Amino acid sequence: MSRYRGPRFKKIRRLGALPGLTSKRPRSGSDLKNPLRSVKKSQYRIRLEEKQKLRFHYGLTERQLLRYVHIAGKAKGSTGQVLLQLLEMRLDNILFRLGMASTIPGARQLVNHRHILVNGRIVDIPSYRCKPRDIITTKDKQRSKALIQTSIASSPHEELPNHLTIDSFQYKGLINQIIDSKWIGLKINELLVVEY
């Protein structure tokens, strides 16, 4: 299956808020699901919706998600926690969490168009796995800095996770450590994703 490129708002209405997919929010009442049509959800549907939330939030294909689940299963610790840590340490997600891009697809585009340097080297792979002590900067070109500047200026100033620090004047971000589970920006039950 290829990456989802269809209407994003339909997915948000179905699955709830996905901050990585788009910055739009459903209006209270009219855009929400019809409350009169409350059908009991099967266990399969609950697990599928949790998996789809994860997929659409991080912009993954089915195969990429399966590969991350296999890697997380082989690692020490809780498979669900390790899975979320792997996804949070992707370069496109780090850019989104730093505020250098308004959405994860926007961060993917910045990386693909070679605007981002990791430790002084151009990285054009959005799924690049960042490590603690990595320094993420923009190219010295004016166009690259202008793109990042508009994103930083327009992004809502949410609390930055404790595993990241940003210097918005030098357009530089630093990864301090691997993310703690309480700082993950998506409300999800990762055990249901692993069980699926």
From Swiss-Prot:
Q: Which GO terms describe its cellular component?
A: chloroplast; small ribosomal subunit
Q: Can you tell me which residues the record assigns to a coiled coil?
A: none
UniProt keywords, alphabetically: Chloroplast, Plastid, Ribonucleoprotein, Ribosomal protein, RNA-binding, rRNA-binding
Tell where it localizes: Plastid, Chloroplast
Taking every annotated instance into account, which residue ranges of this chain make up the domain S4 RNA-binding?
A: 89-149
Q: Which InterPro entries match?
A: Ribosomal_uS4, Ribosomal_uS4_bac-type, Ribosomal_uS4_CS, Ribosomal_uS4_N, S4_RNA-bd, S4_RNA-bd_sf
Q: Name one Pfam family in it.
A: S4
| Principal location | plastid
Q: Which SUPFAM superfamilies does UniProt cross-reference here?
A: Alpha-L RNA-binding motif (SSF55174)
A molecular function annotated in GO for this UniProt entry is:
structural constituent of ribosome
Question: An example of a Gene Ontology BP annotation on this entry?
Answer: translation
Q: Which PANTHER family match?
A: 30S 40S RIBOSOMAL PROTEIN (PTHR11831), SMALL RIBOSOMAL SUBUNIT PROTEIN US4M (PTHR11831:SF4)
Q: How does it assemble?
A: Part of the 30S ribosomal subunit. Contacts protein S5. The interaction surface between S4 and S5 is involved in control of translational fidelity.
Protein role: One of the primary rRNA binding proteins, it binds directly to 16S rRNA where it nucleates assembly of the body of the 30S subunit. With S5 and S12 plays an important role in translational accuracy.
The text of the family note is:
Belongs to the universal ribosomal protein uS4 family.
UniProt cross-references to HAMAP family, sorted A to Z: Ribosomal_uS4_B (MF_01306_B)
Q: What is this protein called?
A: Small ribosomal subunit protein uS4c
Q: Which organism is it from?
A: Asparagus maritimus (Sea asparagus)
